[in-house]
Amino acid sequence: MKIFKTLSSILVTSVLSVTVIPSTFASTESTATNQTQQTVLFDNSHAQTAGAADWVIDGAFSDYADSMRKQGYQVKELEGESNISDQSLQQARVLVIPEANNPFKENEQKAIINFVKNGGSVIFISDHYNADRNLNRIDSSESMNGYRRGAYENMTKDMNNEEKNSNVMHNVKSSDWLSQNFGVRFRYNALGDINTQNIVSSKDSFGITKGVQSVSMHAGSTLAITDPNKAKGIIYMPEHLTHSQKWSHAVDQGIYNGGGINEGPYVAISKIGKGKAAFIGDSSLVEDRSPKYLREDNGKPKKTYDGFKEQDNGKLLNNLTTWLGKKESQSSMKDMGIKLDNKTPLLNFEQPENSIEPQKEP
């Protein structure tokens, strides 16, 4: 669901004072469990329900979670605050990270890398730039990339002492983490309502795009391929996008390279170590119309898209689940026997050290 930022400052305080839940996993897992089932773990420890977001397995991500159960997985949720660790990932086969509105701590980043290199799979689901649900100056693309736009040297730039010293910011260090480890970076663009048929063939996507003819976006971003030996794009935006097709609230030009391959992939995959990763530039592709929570700012029901059922979105996600669940011996895209991508052409302000914040946040 795409929102304009109308949350009050009360929400910032509430987010910074989240109480850590002693139990690592939530009790919302409803499928029968047994020792042979593998576990998909959904992160809900980085403000995944802030603002209009409702990215939980018994809320607006329930269709997605149910599709995984139908593939034989046990689906659980990771609650608390900044709870990703070697221990919390120990029993997981796949880690799903929807829109993280709080940044990852260094130990969490290390745990994710260890998890993937040792054979686990992770999927990062982000959104358009400026989708700052909890008004903490950091949106999901920035959290996942590892640095804040315009604050690469210091992620706490312009924060007051309460924000700087909060539990959320403790042990958070700015870096180009996602690109350095996975070979991709979420671009800070913002595209509008678009259906795309610009899809890589099944044979060049490890079967992920089989049966997928069209995929939708409702205000989202694309990614940059920064290391083709590690990462590959599989879904792209249409060619020749115009200014009118950017998100209406974009704070810059919104569309960076006119769409197509040069805009970077909307959906990408990566192979490192024994494991693998996937990346999606819009939560609307995944969500459904069954939000669980009310908005914190006004107490009204949240409104979400029925994206899982749109176009071939559900088919794509099912295929991604299948691919992420397979173990493979190759440790990079270079070893996978497919044609490698070219690096995505970047604008100067997209270099982390050259990035600027077009509009002060929040």
PLM segments and residue spans:
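An acidic, glycine-rich "communication" segment
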Residues: 129-255
